[in-house]
Amino acid sequence: MRRLFLFIFLSVIICNSAFARKTGCEGDCENGIGTWTYTDQTVYVGGWRESLKHGQGTVTWPNGYIYTGEFVDSKWQGQGTLIFPDGAQYIGEWFNDNMNGQGTFTWANGDMYVGEFIDSKRHGQGTRTNADGTIMKGIWKEGELAESN
């Protein structure tokens, strides 16, 4: 019985130690540079301030998304790049976790939009160039070309 108790006790300690390494911080995740691995295996590597993601960092999700860029109080804010699992990507300005400001979105098929975004939608002056050479240039509203120029 004593051996069984010792075995269970050691198993719990070993499992908890392994689990803690997989779902927690390595480095300084309070006010410095650290790596945090979430229980779903999403990983953040980068700067921290007051236990929030802050400064330059990278988040990698198990489903293939990767964001590399600036964080302010754990939100995507400033310059950053989001790569999608299908190979599409957005490079540009972020505010409050959304594409906001100037940016370039490239679809996996080679189509590309260069211009302004508001709340992750094409909005403002921009140009979409499709892989077949078709060009749509003008004022965009809510993701649609509203006025050609």
What annotation goes with each model-predicted range?
Residues 22-31, 43-54, 66-77, 90-100, ...:
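Conserved anchor residues at repeat-unit boundaries in beta-strand-based tandem repeats, strongest
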Residues 15-20:
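Sec/Tat signal peptide C-region and signal peptidase I cleavage site
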Residues 147-149:
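Short, solvent-exposed mixed-charge patches
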Residues 4-13:
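Sec-dependent N-terminal signal peptides
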